[in-house]
């Protein structure tokens, strides 16, 4: 394939990472981004790698699969991880970032790379004669989505996910909340709004009866479990939220707490957590409260949370439709298209779910696009690594039941020999093997 550059379509997490990886290998990149010419309802700025749903990149420990994935990406020179580390905000054991600072830094690193040319334009056709990484994300424009849909055998794979509301910290009644991380892990990074049993029951009743924004009548409500609207979770059962975002375990009342409680219990019946959303600490998001309620209903119901009675919402929760591909039938383990070999796909459209996973897919797609350009052999990462297991899973899953997947230890190749019963010790061993295998893979 004779060409002098590689196309990357989309400058989200996956596209920005792919473009950067290609350019770092000495190959010119044309990076196309339609924002600036055509906006989407969910994005607030024209910056790259904008975080729409949450500002958290989740756990950082190696005993957490996404923590392992992040460490692998660091070792592979990820621009997304480098920018995240530079803009992180307190979040206990998680890696959370200043949302605007993070996307601004990614934008600057990509735009200022001497081998990356940014083109602000909407692409409506899939190129046939140039190596191209398609990373247009869940909010792909209708025109291009139609072309991808045709590659996808006409099957419409989709699910809905949602973003949580963001609140002005100065409007939170601090006398009713307390600062603490679950199990006191890391620094006290979350504001916790405790509820008594009666407060929770009243809140649940209001939530399940609140009015939702309508979906298109011809579409079914299919949600990804990791980003499920809080009202959908509440309707599954009165205690479902108590095992999810309102779980009180490890969030005991502080000694100086004087607010309402159930008898002498040391732990609240339920807890709503708020996490810092920007470096200045002026904004907080309600953790796990992705929602599709009408905005007026969000204000009414969420102001029932102790401490939020007069809260000002700087952004209400929103929901959007995510389309994804039949990757088991359409993609190689390198994220290369089986039907149109000049194309690579990356990001949530491939069926990886989560910010870190999207960036990881862009990293692998970018590396392999560069290798194809240089006529080098493809790079298939070991299934013993987090980054390799994710690529293997989405390309080898049962197509009939394929759904988006977060990275987890269940998809990483099992350890050989006798099973280690202690979960933490087992995960430590898997992580140790993964990093050793990655280092060996990179030296071959």
UniProtKB/Swiss-Prot annotation:
Catalytic activity, reaction form: uridine(54) in tRNA + (6R)-5,10-methylene-5,6,7,8-tetrahydrofolate + NADH + H(+) = 5-methyluridine(54) in tRNA + (6S)-5,6,7,8-tetrahydrofolate + NAD(+); uridine(54) in tRNA + (6R)-5,10-methylene-5,6,7,8-tetrahydrofolate + NADPH + H(+) = 5-methyluridine(54) in tRNA + (6S)-5,6,7,8-tetrahydrofolate + NADP(+)
Subcellular location: Cytoplasm
Name of the protein in question: Methylenetetrahydrofolate--tRNA-(uracil-5-)-methyltransferase TrmFO
Family membership noted in the UniProt record: Belongs to the MnmG family. TrmFO subfamily.
Cited function: Catalyzes the folate-dependent formation of 5-methyl-uridine at position 54 (M-5-U54) in all tRNAs.
GO MF annotations, alphabetized: flavin adenine dinucleotide binding; tRNA (uracil(54)-C5)-methyltransferase activity, 5,10-methylenetetrahydrofolate-dependent
EC number from the UniProt entry: 2.1.1.74
Keyword annotations: Cytoplasm, FAD, Flavoprotein, Methyltransferase, NAD, NADP, Transferase, tRNA processing
Record GO cellular component, one term: cytosol
Requisite cofactors: FAD
Organism: Streptococcus pneumoniae (strain 70585)
A Pfam entry, by short name: GIDA
Highest taxon above the source species: Bacteria
SUPFAM superfamilies with a match to the protein in the record: FAD/NAD(P)-binding domain (SSF51905)
InterPro entries associated with the record: FAD/NAD-bd_sf, MnmG-rel, MnmG-rel_CS, MnmG_N, TrmFO
Residues reported to bind FAD: 10-15
Biological-process GO terms, alphabetical: tRNA methylation; tRNA wobble uridine modification
Coiled-coil region: none
């Amino acid at each position: 394939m004779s060409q002098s550059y590689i196309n990357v379509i989309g400058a989200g997490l996956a596209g920005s990472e792919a473009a950067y990886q290609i350019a770092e290998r000495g190959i010119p990149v044309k990076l196309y981004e339609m924002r600036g010419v055509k906006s989407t309802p969910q994005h607030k700025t024209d910056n790259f790698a904008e975080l729409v749903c949450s500002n958290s990149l989740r756990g950082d420990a190696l005993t957490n699969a996404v923590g392992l994935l992040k460490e692998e990406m660091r070792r592979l020179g990820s621009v997304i991880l480098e920018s995240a580390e530079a803009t992180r905000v307190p979040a206990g054991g998680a890696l959370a970032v200043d949302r605007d600072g993070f996307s601004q830094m990614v934008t600057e690193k990509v735009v200022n790379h001497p081998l990356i040319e940014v083109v602000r334009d909407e692409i409506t056709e899939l190129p046939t004669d140039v190596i191209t990484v398609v990373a247009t994300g869940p909010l792909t424009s209708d025109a291009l989505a139609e072309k991808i849909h045709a590659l996808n055998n006409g099957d419409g794979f989709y699910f809905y996910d949602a973003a949580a509301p963001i609140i002005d910290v100065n409007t939170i009644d601090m006398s009713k909340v307390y600062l603490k991380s679950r199990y006191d892990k890391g620094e006290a990074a979350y504001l916790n709004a405790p509820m008594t049993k009666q407060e929770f029951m009243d809140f649940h009743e209001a939530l399940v009866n609140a009015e939702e924004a309508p979906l298109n009548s011809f579409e079914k409500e299919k949600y990804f479990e990791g980003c499920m609207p809080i009202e959908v979770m509440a309707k599954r059962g009165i205690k479902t939220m108590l095992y999810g975002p309102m779980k009180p375990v490890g969030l005991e009342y502080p000694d100086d707490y004087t607010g309402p409680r159930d008898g002498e219990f040391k732990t609240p019946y339920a807890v709503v957590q708020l996490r810092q959303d920007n470096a200045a600490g002026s904004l907080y998001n309600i953790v796990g409260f992705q929602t599709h309620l009408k905005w007026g209903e969000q204000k009414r119901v969420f102001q029932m949370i102790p401490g939020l009675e007069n809260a000002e919402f700087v952004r209400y929760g929103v929901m959007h439709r995510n389309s994804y591909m039949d990757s088991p039938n359409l993609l190689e383990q390198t994220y290369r298209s089986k039907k149109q070999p000049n194309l690579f796909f990356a990001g949530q459209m491939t069926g990886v779910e989560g910010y870190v996973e999207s960036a990881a897919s862009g990293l692998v797609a970018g590396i392999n696009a560069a290798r194809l350009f240089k006529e080098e052999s493809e790079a298939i990462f070991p299934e013993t690594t987090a980054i390799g297991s994710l690529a293997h899973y989405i390309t080898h899953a049962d197509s009939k039941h394929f759904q988006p997947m977060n990275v987890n230890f269940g998809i990483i190749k099992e350890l050989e020999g006798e099973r280690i019963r202690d979960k933490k010790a087992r995960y430590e061993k898997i992580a140790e093997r993964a990093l050793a295998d990655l280092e060996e893979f990179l030296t071959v």
